[in-house]
Structures are given as structure tokens and as C-alpha cells.
């Protein structure tokens, strides 16, 4: 094979050294190390040190090296923090900002030294130099104290060491090469597994085109069009064309992860050779009742890194769809941590199915793909993308409570005077803020508090490192991570954040760094890949989601038509009821109950009723419980607060197609049953939606409204109406899941008759009937009579 035609496999320096050099136990009691480095590379400390180093110091130098093999090449690349190339010799500088007291750091952390040695070898190789001084610069985040370690390495030693490093990686590279050839051959022959539904092919073409142009795409596609396969298939085809080398399928809920797994299986049955792993939360994978990732508490942590390579190598050669159950089987066989095994497998598969937070959350995201300076040929599919707005705000915000400082002080009062003193300093500043806060208060700056918290973080890190068996270590560790996240978030503050304090209803005093517009933070992650497709059945208005998910109103957008016969669905809007707070009274609750009785009485079947709150639900339930007509017409069951998985499954089991009586489920709008519930083929024939779904007026919503008003936009729409309407459309989407289904959607609130609400209706809602309590039965009777004729 000609050298020019060789396939290039890419690997980052960081991932290479972390993968090859790890050994021994898994131990999360250590708070220092490569994975705990404060702020990651490229932080404020890096820039500050780099600016101090003078004219000879070149910062952020991109270095690459190609390793030639018979059939392929390995491109290993990274970014050196600093290069000092003087006539008297070369120095490679690797900077790490850490919280721990530098007195406890007696030698460089091995993986950091290995990274710097790689850069030293690359630079010497490219510039024909005889060797380099490898320098590790550690800087305490709070004090800015610096400790440097230097070791001189001749080129021959660097070369021999690097060859040994690469030798350990070659068998894995061969796997990637051979697997990639077989995968791409299968993709070229792959056809769409079913006849295309109306609009489905256009959707697939739009996805492929956007990926070919390395653009992002927003898709509004109603239920039933087959969004998962319509986005997966063209994405896989794009990978076969070399437009990406790893596909991330991102979801907000477990149920949609299952749909993605099933869709990949369908394509494999059609000949696709493509392996995937589903990343599951640590708590759901751990063999222990409570995860304790250290060799003293968990036998799977002891010697984990000595065995995990063999486990990964076997699983990627034997399995294609690597689910939670598969992970657990191999983890038991090889005696390794199932969660860490799962993360390692992600390096070697074609597709990763995971929750949003593994890509976006700065505390949880997969650093092997998304750390500073690391990018790749990634393709992102963001399922149920409407959820990413609120999830994004949550992931990029930070909260601390004053009371937690007092709790930790109580735990450490007789143990560590230095920490107690810092806790007092922080508490004093929070107390000052509390005195100035009536209900809530917006703040401009909290620099003094952050400085104190940074000192506290450093001391807590020292304490945790030394006191690994402290009785309340878990509480202190959680507090440490909370503070670290606050500092991390503080360093990201820009015009898209608001800082505020609030006296909570439970008596606690809260400080929050609130990310009101997450677009910039989300884009920072997505820009590490080639293309992103956001899709949902409720992505309206699309301009709202463009602004808050990517920040670019010029992104591509597609509106897919509904594939279903509109005659099988009736949409009614009630003009004589409303869930406005001023209208929440006994008379209104009774009217809602009367609507339910009239709606259900016209056709036996299963119905879901979505109410504005638990309180509202209980009011309606109390009326139904004593209404004789209701008792004769249907059986009902109410959603409870904090239902576990088994209770939810039991609730959904009530929706049988062959019930002898009608069944009504009373649910809360925006709750667990509002989306991701697939009750098809006669299991649900009606969704009754009470109210417009507006979020409750609270501090967060008030701040959101103020932020968008300040930007000259419609603050009420952004903070209340759009999120509310999304909940309405999600609830309505529970009805009619297949072309065999039929049913009704009842919008019980007069506000839906206003033009600003109707402007937000999806296209398939064209044509609705306005009803009152005394006319609704006639409209329903006509609809069901026509449906019987249609049968």
C-alpha cells in the first residue's frame, strides 16, 4: 500500500499516556492527580504564568508526531503549555493548576511528566535537537505559589521511552484500523431498514447534508415520523464517507436511550458492523449498595487498572451493542469496576449512547473527549433537544448554602483549626450577604468570598488527601466538590450569568451563580466535533432553541410534516375554563371535573389528564371521588410525588387496550408521564391538558424574564410562555403514536384561543374546535361517530 493512502488514526497525547501508563488500584480518595487537576488545562493560571515567562516563552504550542505502521499511521497530537527554545537548550513546560498545598507535592505526578516527555520528544524530533529539559510547573490556584520540577532528558532516552509507550498501544491501533475497514464496508452497503414514511427521507437527506457541510441542524419532527432512525441512518452514512469517526447519541431520559439501542440493533440486523456502548450512571452499575471506589471498600477497585485492559480488549472483539447488562457481565468476569470499564470501552467503539451530562457537564463530561485542547471528528445527535435548555442552565450553574459551612465546621471543629478559620471567614461573608437580602438579591461581584473559598478548597484537598479514613469523609468530599464547582463556575462568568442570593422557604440561605443562557457553554463542547443535530417533537419556536442551544440564528432548520391522517385526531379548545391563579377556585375545579366526565363518557378507553400542579390534581381528584357519574364512567389513578421506577411501571401497566372499563390517569404536566411515554395501538385515546403549562413565578423565572427584557427580547415569552407551551405539546404528544391510533387532544384553557398561543401551535394542529361545557359532548360524539364510519 502506498504511504499516501494509509489510513490515519488519531490519538491525543493525554489519552495515550493515561491509557498506557495506568496500573494498580482505582482509588477516588485521592483528590490530586491528572483527573483532578484544577480547572483543567488552559485556565486562568496557565495564561497568567505564560504571560510572566518572557519573550523566549512560546505558549500553547501544537505538537504532532506520526508513527508509521505497515497498514496505517498513528497521528499523536497535543498542545505543550510552553516551549523555551534557546541556543543553550530546549525546555518543555507543562503547567498544572492545583488546589493542594505544594508542600505535599514532592515529585511530579507521573502522567503529567509523561505528557511533557511526549512533547519533548516531538519537538526534538522535528527540530533535530539532542535533548530537552522537561519542566513541570505546579501552581496553587489560591496562593499562586509555584513549584517546578526539572529533569534533563537526552533525545535517545526520550525516543526509547516513547517507542516503548507506543509499543503498548499498537495492538489497540491495529484493532481500530481493521475494525474501521470492516465498519466502512458495511456502511457502504447499508440501506434504510424500512420503506420510508412521508417526510422521513427528506429528514435523512437534511441530516446528511448538514454533516457534509459541517453545520448544525435543528429538526422539528412530530411523533411517528421515526426521528431516531431518520437521524441515525444518515449519521452512520456520513461516518462511512469519512465525515466523522465517533457518533454521540445524547439523551435526557433512560427510555430514549433504549430506543437508540433498539435502532442500532435494527441496523445491525441489516448488515451494519458498528459497535456502541451505553454509558450508565455509576450508581446503576456499581456492585456495591453505595459506590465506594477504593481498594479497601471494593474488591473490584483493587488492581482494577491491571485487569481492565484485558476486559476492554475482549468485550470490543466479542460484543456489538454493549449495554448495561453486558458491562456487568464482563466486569464480574474480569473483577473490574463496571463504571470505569464502561468509560474505557467508549474509546474503542463507533457510537456512544449517553446522557447529556457526559458531553456537557464540566464536572461529569468525558474528559478524554472534551477537555481543554482535545477535539475530534465527532458527530452529535441530541435527542429530545428541548430538554437541553433547562439541563444546560443546571449544568453550568453553581449553588452553595450558608448552612453547609456551619455543618462542616461542626464536623472539623476539634480536628483542623486552619479549615475552621477559613469556614468562619466564608460564613461571615455569607452572613453579611444574608443581612442585605430580603427575599432575593442580585449581586455584581463576590470576589472576596471566592478568594476565601479558593483557600478553603486548597485546605480541604490537603485534609482529604491525608485523612482517607475520616468518619465523615463523604460529607466533606461532597462539600469540597460543591465549592470546587462554584470556583470553576465563577471563572466562567460572563454576560450570560446572573449572581443572586435568596432566602429559601426551608430557612436556608442560598448563593447561586445562575447561567441564564447556556448557548456559549454548550457551543464550547459542540465545537469540539464536526456537526450537531438537535431534534425533538417540540422544538418550537425554533428561533428560541437556536438562541439558547447554539447562539446562532442562522443554523439550518427543518420542519418535518406529520405522517398521520389528521382525520384520526380531534383537537378541542375550551373557551369557558382557565387555570389562571385568579381562577383557581372550587367552581373552576368542578368545571374541569365535568369536562373529564363528559369527554370520557363519549368513548370507552384510556385517557391521560395533565394538571398544572399536585395541589390542582388533588382538588380535581377530591371532586371525582364523590361524583357518582364519574364512578360509573371510569376508574382513575393519580400520579404521586417521588414515584420510584417500579411504581411508575405499575402505573403504566394500567393502560391496557383490553380493559373492561375506561381508565383515567391524573398526572402533573411536566412530570415523569408528560414525555417519553409510548402508549400506542389503542392503549391511549385521549390527552386532556388543563392550563398553559406556565412555570410558577419564582426567583429563577423572574431573573430569566429580566435578563431577556434587558436584551430587548420578550422576557415573558422566553421565561414563561415558550417553556409552558413546550410542556403542553409534550403532553399532547402522548396521543397517536402510530398510523393505527386515533384519539382526542383537549386543551382546557381559554388562553389557547389567543393568537400568541396559536402562533406556537405545531402545523399539524391546524383546525381545532372551540367548545364550552354545554357543547363539548356534541363535538366529541360527531368525531367518534365519524371514526366508527371510517373503520
Model-derived regions, located:
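Conserved pre-motif I regulatory segment
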Residues: 177-220
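Signature of the SF2 helicase/ATPase Hel1-core->accessory helical subdomain module
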Residues: 231, 258, 332-351, 355-458, ...
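A contiguous, basic/glycine-rich beta-loop/short-helix subdomain that forms a polymer-engagement track
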Residues: 327-352, 363-370, 462-578, 587-588, ...
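Mg2+/Mn2+-dependent nuclease catalytic core
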Residues: 65-160
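Walker A/P-loop
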Residues: 212-234
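Conserved RecA-like P-loop NTPase helicase motor core
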Residues: 575-587, 640-752
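A substrate-engagement module of RecA-like helicase motors
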Residues: 184, 191, 243-352, 360, ...
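Metal-dependent nuclease catalytic cores that hydrolyze phosphodiester bonds in DNA/RNA
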Residues: 1-88
Amino acid at each position: 500500500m502506498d504511504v499516501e493512502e494509509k489510513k490515519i488514526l488519531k490519538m491525543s497525547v493525554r489519552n495515550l499516556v493515561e491509557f498506557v501508563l495506568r496500573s494498580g488500584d482505582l482509588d477516588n480518595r485521592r483528590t490530586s492527580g491528572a483527573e483532578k487537576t484544577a480547572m483543567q488545562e488552559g485556565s486562568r493560571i496557565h495564561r497568567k504564568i505564560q504571560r510572566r515567562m518572557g519573550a523566549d516563552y512560546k505558549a500553547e504550542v501544537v505538537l504532532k508526531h506520526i508513527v508509521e505502521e505497515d497498514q496505517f499511521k498513528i497521528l499523536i497530537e497535543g498542545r505543550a503549555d510552553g516551549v523555551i527554545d534557546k541556543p543553550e537548550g530546549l525546555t518543555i513546560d507543562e503547567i498544572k493548576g492545583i488546589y493542594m498545598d505544594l508542600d505535599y507535592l514532592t515529585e511530579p505526578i507521573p502522567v503529567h511528566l509523561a505528557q511533557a516527555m511526549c512533547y519533548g520528544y516531538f519537538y526534538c524530533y522535528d527540530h533535530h535537537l539532542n535533548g530537552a529539559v522537561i519542566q513541570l510547573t505546579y501552581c496553587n490556584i489560591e496562593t499562586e505559589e509555584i513549584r517546578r520540577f526539572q529533569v534533563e532528558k537526552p533525545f535517545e532516552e526520550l525516543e526509547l521511552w516513547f517507542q516503548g509507550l507506543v509499543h503498548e498501544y499498537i495492538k489497540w491501533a491495529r484493532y481500530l484500523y481493521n475494525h474501521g475497514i470492516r465498519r466502512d464496508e458495511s456502511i457502504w452497503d447499508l440501506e434504510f431498514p424500512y420503506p420510508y414514511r412521508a417526510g422521513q427521507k427528506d429528514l435523512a437527506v437534511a441530516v446528511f447534508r448538514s454533516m457534509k457541510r459541517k453545520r448544525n441542524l435543528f429538526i422539528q419532527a412530530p411523533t411517528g415520523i421515526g426521528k431516531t432512525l431518520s437521524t441515525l441512518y444518515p449519521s452512520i452514512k456520513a461516518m462511512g464517507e469519512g465525515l466523522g469517526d465517533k457518533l454521540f447519541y445524547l439523551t435526557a431520559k433512560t427510555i430514549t436511550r433504549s430506543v437508540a439501542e433498539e435502532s442500532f440493533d435494527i441496523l445491525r440486523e441489516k448488515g451494519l458492523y458498528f459497535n456502541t456502548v451505553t454509558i450508565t450512571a455509576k450508581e446503576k452499575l456499581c456492585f456495591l449498595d453505595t459506590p465506594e471506589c477504593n481498594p479497601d471498600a471494593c474488591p473490584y477497585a483493587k488492581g482494577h487498572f491491571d485487569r481492565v485492559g484485558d476486559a476492554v480488549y475482549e468485550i470490543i472483539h466479542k460484543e456489538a451493542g454493549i449495554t448495561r447488562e453486558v458491562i456487568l457481565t464482563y466486569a464480574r468476569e474480569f473483577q473490574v469496576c463496571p463504571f470505569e470499564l464502561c468509560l474505557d470501552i467508549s474509546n474503542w467503539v463507533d457510537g456512544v449512547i449517553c446522557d447529556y451530562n457526559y458531553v456537557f457537564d464540566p464536572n461529569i463530561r468525558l474528559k478524554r473527549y472534551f477537555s481543554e485542547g482535545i477535539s475530534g471528528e465527532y458527530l452529535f445527535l441530541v435527542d429530545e433537544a428541548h430538554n437541553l435548555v433547562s439541563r444546560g442552565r443546571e449544568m453550568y450553574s453553581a449553588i452553595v448554602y450558608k448552612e453547609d459551612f456551619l455543618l462542616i465546621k461542626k464536623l472539623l471543629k476539634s480536628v483542623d483549626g486552619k479549615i475552621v478559620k477559613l469556614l468562619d471567614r466564608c460564613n461571615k461573608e455569607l452572613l453579611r450577604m444574608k443581612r442585605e437580602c430580603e427575599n432575593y438579591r442580585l449581586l455584581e461581584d463576590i470576589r472576596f468570598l471566592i478568594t476565601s473559598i479558593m483557600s478553603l478548597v486548597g485546605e480541604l484537598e490537603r485534609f482529604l488527601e491525608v485523612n482517607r479514613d475520616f468518619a465523615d469523609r463523604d460529607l466533606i468530599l461532597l462539600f469540597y466538590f460543591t465549592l470546587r464547582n462554584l470556583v470553576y463556575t465563577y471563572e466562567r462568568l460572563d454576560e450570560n450569568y446572573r449572581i443572586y442570593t435568596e432566602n429559601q422557604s426551608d430557612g436556608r440561605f442560598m448563593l447561586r451563580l445562575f447561567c441564564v443562557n447556556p448557548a456559549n457553554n454548550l457551543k464550547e463542547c459542540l465545537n469540539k466535533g464536526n456537526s450537531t443535530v438537535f431534534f425533538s417533537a417540540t422544538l418550537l419556536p425554533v428561533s428560541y432553541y437556536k438562541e439558547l442551544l447554539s447562539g446562532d440564528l442562522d443554523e439550518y432548520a427543518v420542519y418535518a410534516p406529520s405522517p398521520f391522517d389528521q382525520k384520526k385526531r380531534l383537537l378541542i379548545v375550551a373557551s369557558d375554563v382557565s387555570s389562571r391563579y385568579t381562577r383557581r377556585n372550587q367552581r373552576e375545579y368542578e368545571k374541569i371535573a365535568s369536562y373529564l366526565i363528559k369527554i370520557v363518557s363519549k368513548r370507552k378507553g384510556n385517557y391521560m389528564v395533565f394538571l398544572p400542579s399536585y395541589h390542582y390534581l388533588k382538588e380535581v381528584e377530591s371532586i371525582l371521588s364523590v361524583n357518582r357519574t364519574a364512578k360509573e364512567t371510569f376508574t382513575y389513578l393519580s400520579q404521586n410525588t417521588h414515584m420510584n421506577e417500579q411504581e411508575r411501571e405499575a402505573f403504566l401497566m394500567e393502560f391496557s387496550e383490553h380493559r373492561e372499563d375506561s381508565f383515567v390517569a391524573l398526572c402533573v404536566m411536566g412530570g415523569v408521564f408528560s414525555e417519553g411515554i409510548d402508549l400506542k395501538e389503542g392503549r391511549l385515546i385521549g390527552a386532556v391538558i388543563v392550563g398553559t403549562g406556565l412555570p410558577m413565578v419564582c426567583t429563577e423565572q423572574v431573573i430569566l424574564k429580566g435578563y431577556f427584557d434587558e436584551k430587548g427580547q420578550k422576557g415573558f415569552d422566553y421565561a414563561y410562555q415558550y417553556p409552558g407551551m413546550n410542556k403542553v405539546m409534550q403532553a399532547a404528544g402522548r396521543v397517536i403514536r402510530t398510523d393505527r391510533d386515533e384519539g382526542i387532544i383537549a386543551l382546557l384553557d381559554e388562553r389557547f384561543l389567543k393568537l400568541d398561543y396559536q402562533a406556537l401551535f405545531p402545523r399539524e394542529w391546524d383546525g381545532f374546535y372551540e367548545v364550552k361545557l354545554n357543547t363539548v359532548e356534541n363535538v366529541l360524539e360527531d368525531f367518534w361517530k365519524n371514526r366508527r364510519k371510517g373503520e
